Regions:
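HKD-type phospholipase D/PLD-like phosphodiesterase module
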Residues: 1-5, 13-35, 119-154
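Conserved small/polar residues in nucleotide/adenosyl-binding loops
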Residues: 2-11, 243-248
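Signature of lipid phosphatidyltransferase scaffolds
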Residues: 5, 10-72, 76, 160-166, ...
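Proline/glycine-anchored alpha-helix kink/cap motifs
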Residues: 9, 78-85, 106-117, 146, ...
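Active-site lining segments that contact anionic ligands and/or coordinate catalytic metals
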Residues: 25, 87-89, 115, 133-136, ...
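Primarily the HKD phosphodiesterase
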Residues: 74-137
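Intrinsically disordered, low-complexity eukaryotic regions enriched in glycine, serine
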Residues: 233-235
Length: 250
């Protein structure tokens, strides 16, 4: 409660609260009291209860409604930036990349000069190292924990946009299911996710490139400082918690 008024907080996660999978899955979650997101979630549950058939979402991106149009807009923005000779970057972390339409969007972005990094744990139907995908790299991490988070980064002219949610880029997720994605609005949380993606892209112990034959090629280079992303990010989060605790004590 906030000054005798009810304060509603919602949780949006890339996974669920399961006592078994929580021990082995690596997920990301957001607790928020942002009124716009809270209201969007309320609308979403009304959709699930069949009380609303044509919902209007202000912040939340929901499959079968506004998710795909917004993804195309975000990719299109990066394409326009690249064509204008400005920095254009996309980083997409997910479990699976299979939808032909969205793969074509990424090919178009690559051809326009957008630098794209994909972190895909499972099935990936995009083929790198081709003339139409020369600006796309695919990383796969297989380590102690199952990589389960879906986090999407768009450079957006130096004002990064971060999104997090449940859908992979598969036809079943984008066209048939109800899946939700939230923007990350808090700048500190944005930076944490950006740092997570950066650490994962530096992994040279448990990560591999996916080549044009869709085979895994280990990144290991004896001349580079070893980085094991899952453990490095764990230490990173511990340092964030210690910093927060020290700041609270001052």
């Amino acid at each position: 409660r906030r000054q005798r008024q009810m304060c509603i907080r919602d949780s949006i996660s890339t996974g669920n609260f399961n006592e078994k999978t929580a021990r082995i899955y690596a997920d990301s979650g957001l607790f928020t009291s942002n009124e716009i997101i809270v209201n969007d979630l309320y609308t979403l549950f009304r959709v699930l209860q069949k009380e609303v058939t044509e919902p209007k979402f202000k912040r939340l991106l929901v499959a079968r409604f506004n998710l795909l149009p917004e993804l195309r807009r975000r990719i299109g923005y990066e394409i326009n930036m690249a064509k204008a000779g400005k920095e254009a970057r996309i980083i997409l972390k997910m479990n699976a990349l299979q939808d032909p339409a969205m793969i074509d969007e990424l090919y178009k972005a690559s051809e326009a000069g957008v630098k794209i990094d994909l972190i895909v744990r499972g099935i990936c139907c995009l083929i790198p190292n081709q003339p139409y995908s020369r600006n796309i790299r695919i990383t796969r991490i297989v380590d102690s924990f199952l990589e389960h988070a879906r986090v999407w980064y768009f450079h957006h002219g130096g004002k990064p946009l971060l999104f997090m949610g449940s859908p992979d880029w598969m036809r079943r997720n984008l066209y048939r299911r109800i899946e939700a994605v939230t923007p990350i609005l808090d700048e500190d949380l944005k930076q944490q996710l950006i740092d997570m993606l950066a650490i994962q892209l530096k992994d040279n112990r448990k990560a591999g490139w996916v080549d044009e034959n869709l085979n895994n090629v280990l990144k290991r280079n004896p001349e580079e400082e070893p980085v094991r992303a899952q453990y490095a990010f764990y230490e990173y989060l511990k340092s964030c918690l210690l910093y927060t605790s020290d700041a609270a004590d001052e």
